[in-house]
Amino acid sequence: MIIDSTDKKLLGLLQEDANISTSALADKLHISQSPCWRRINRLEEQGIIQKRVAVLDREALGMSVVVFATVNLTQTGRQNLIEFEQMIKGHPEVLECYTMTGIWDYVLKIVTRDVRHYEDFVRNTLSASDLIREL
């Protein structure tokens, strides 16, 4: 899987605007449309480009609070880790979940409309879970 400077520039342009046309991309890369399309297709087939997404404006959607919360589990056995990750996937407030090393097991990126909604989520969901020892 070799990525040359043209691929890197193409990827940068797609990260800025995933809706950019192949024609506009080709112009910016100083190549014709066919090789540009082939490069995009190859990068998708290799899994380098996994998907194209829309980046949403949280505030315009009324989701103004972002919190990074650290979590310790009651036990860190494989089954507990799987159960915790499955539980977290069911909550749209949690945008990202990362495994940590050190004193915390996970860090969560939580987005809510306001502080009260965040507090309710912590109290009624996270703190209520038998899987979580400490927040």
Language-model segments: what does each one mean?
Residues 1-135:
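A compositional/biophysical signature of low hydrophobicity enriched in polar/charged and small residues
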